[in-house]
Curated annotation (Swiss-Prot):
Reactions catalysed: S-adenosyl-L-homocysteine + H2O = L-homocysteine + adenosine
Binding-site list for NAD(+): 206-208, 240, 269-274, 292, 327, 348-350, 397
Gene Ontology terms, MF aspect: adenosylhomocysteinase activity
Binding site for substrate: 64, 139, 205, 235, 239
Highest taxon, organism lineage: Eukaryota
Annotated family: Belongs to the adenosylhomocysteinase family.
Cofactor note: Binds 1 NAD(+) per subunit.
Necessary cofactors: NAD(+)
Single GO BP term: S-adenosylmethionine cycle
Designated name of the protein: Adenosylhomocysteinase
Pathway(s) per entry: Amino-acid biosynthesis; L-homocysteine biosynthesis; L-homocysteine from S-adenosyl-L-homocysteine: step 1/1
EC class name: hydrolase
Length: 485
């Protein structure tokens, strides 16, 4: 693949769409800083002591303006950083340009091919002589996956001389991963094992990536400690819920200009992301229907006045379909064939396998009409009617809009900084084994507290008598570990 790394005048590596967009990115970054009090508080509290001095951090997370503030928080605390996006459509090119010019090595641009995406991921992990990163900030688990698959292939190659065969899988993306690893064996047959030996740990941002980590922990194949940032309350109950409540209608309207009021909208899944999406559509005037497998989540939806049906019940009646499950094969091509003309189909889960894009793309005689970037009308030959698919089945709020707003991302990214600090500060203590951990409650509460002042909140304080009565410390933590917010 004919891609090459470029360098700034200071020698920093990068590959972005257009470095001349850096000034624009810097202006938006400065606006975002005001809306991200948690990250700015981290700079104030930890910056003087430079706790990340000597640390190499690789990040695979949407290269947005908000992520730019996270990156510059990590560098302000002393880290060296290399970054790529975790989605081919989610990068904001002006944000990538600003960071590449001013702060860190970035390999990201909006509209990457899958080959380019994995090239960027490989570059993000490549620190040259001396192995890879000390720490990983991951979103969806692709950087973690590449290292695990690389180590597995190197061990097999050393034992038997066998190299990965890209044709051994039907998954087109995994073919690319195996090709990268196979080609890497020719130049360095221990590259990923050297990365593994150096790695202190990973902090994972999203539900999908966390599932991967727990699967590896269960199978005994997890190679390094991991902190599950997603299940911090100040992440899942804010980013996943309120972030999606904001960004789903933003993406829908930017992509289609459709009026949501009066439409029938189907939300597949009613976890935190699904709850935010359903609330947004309901507030916009849609008649919302939810599909669910979990009776508890289904009952929650019913208590909100939302009908629970199967996709088959409503596929020919609804106007908007949103997948939020984190699972595969939710909306299949046979469902899409039965939809009404110009029904909108989109996904706000991390990967592109919730909607059967392969089945749609290979359907005999189907015609794809690109209306604008990330907005395509697919016309079926039998009916001459079509559906509108957003962001090619990938994250529509980042593919068709700019994702979640800065304030809610400050909550998530403050958790990331704290998780990275926790891993780095405890690297020699043995506190963290090759398992998945969640940040303790007092740190979760600290993240929330850092964001209250921006909104003008004033907390009530327990008296000593009240504290003794309910056996809760005056300064917290205020809830038990299993409390459900």
């Amino acid at each position: 693949m004919a891609l090459s790394v470029e360098k700034t005048s200071s020698g920093r590596e990068y590959k972005v769409k257009d470095l001349f967009q850096a000034d624009f990115g810097r202006l938006e970054l400065e606006l975002a800083e005001v809306e991200m009090p948690g990250l700015m508080a981290c700079r104030t509290e930890f910056g003087p002591s430079q706790p990340f001095k000597g640390a190499r951090i690789s990040g695979s997370l949407h290269m947005t303006i908000q992520t730019a503030v996270l990156i510059e928080t990590l560098t302000a605390l002393g880290a060296e950083v290399r970054w790529c996006s975790c989605n081919i459509f989610s990068s904001q090119d002006h944000a990538a340009a600003a960071i590449a010019r001013d702060s860190a090595a970035v390999f990201a641009w909006k509209g990457e091919t899958l080959e380019e995406y994995w090239w960027c991921t490989e570059r993000c992990l490549d620190w040259g002589v001396g192995g890879g990163p000390d720490l990983i900030v991951d979103d969806g688990g692709d950087a973690t996956l590449l290292i695990h698959e690389g180590v597995k292939a190197e061990e097999e190659f050393e034992k038997s001389g066998k190299v990965p065969d890209p044709e051994s899988t039907d998954n087109p993306e995994f073919k690319i991963v195996l090709t990268i690893i196979r080609d890497g064996l020719k130049t360095d047959a221990s590259k990923y094992r050297k990365m593994k030996e150096r790695l202190v740990g990973v902090s994972e941002e999203t539900t999908t990536g966390v599932k991967r980590l727990y699967q590896m922990q269960e199978s005994g194949t997890l190679l390094f400690p991991a902190i599950n940032v997603n299940d911090s309350v100040t992440k899942s109950k804010f980013d996943n819920l309120y972030g999606c409540r904001h960004s789903l209608p933003d993406g829908l309207m930017r992509a289609t200009d459709v009026m949501i009021a009066g439409k029938v909208a189907v939300v597949c899944g009613y976890g935190d992301v699904g709850k935010g999406c359903a609330a947004a559509l309901k507030q916009a005037g849609a008649r919302v229907i939810v599909t669910e497998i979990d009776p508890i989540c289904a009952l929650q939806a019913l208590m909100e006045g939302i009908q629970i049906l199967t996709l088959e019940d409503v596929v020919s009646e609804a106007d908007i379909f949103v997948t939020t499950t984190g699972n595969k094969d939710i909306i299949m091509v046979d469902h899409m064939r039965k939809m009404k003309n110009n029904a909108i189909v989109c996904n706000i889960g991390h990967f592109d396998n919730e909607i059967d894009m392969n089945g749609l793309e290979t359907y005999p005689g189907v015609k794809r009409i690109t209306i604008k970037p990330q907005t395509d009308r697919w016309v079926f030959p039998e009916t001459k009617t079509g559906i509108i698919v957003l962001a090619e089945g990938r994250l529509m709020n980042l593919g068709c809009a700019t994702g979640h707003p800065s304030f809610v991302m400050s909550c998530s990214f403050t958790n990331q900084v704290i998780a990275q600090l926790e891993l780095w500060n405890e690297k020699a203590s043995g506190k963290y084994e090759k398992k998945v951990y969640v940040l303790p409650k007092h740190l979760d509460e600290k993240v929330a507290a850092l964001h209250l002042g921006k909104l003008g909140a004033r907390l009530t304080k327990l008296t000593k008598s009240q504290s003794d009565y309910i056996s809760i410390p005056i300064e917290g933590p205020y809830k038990l570990r299993l409390y459900r917010y």
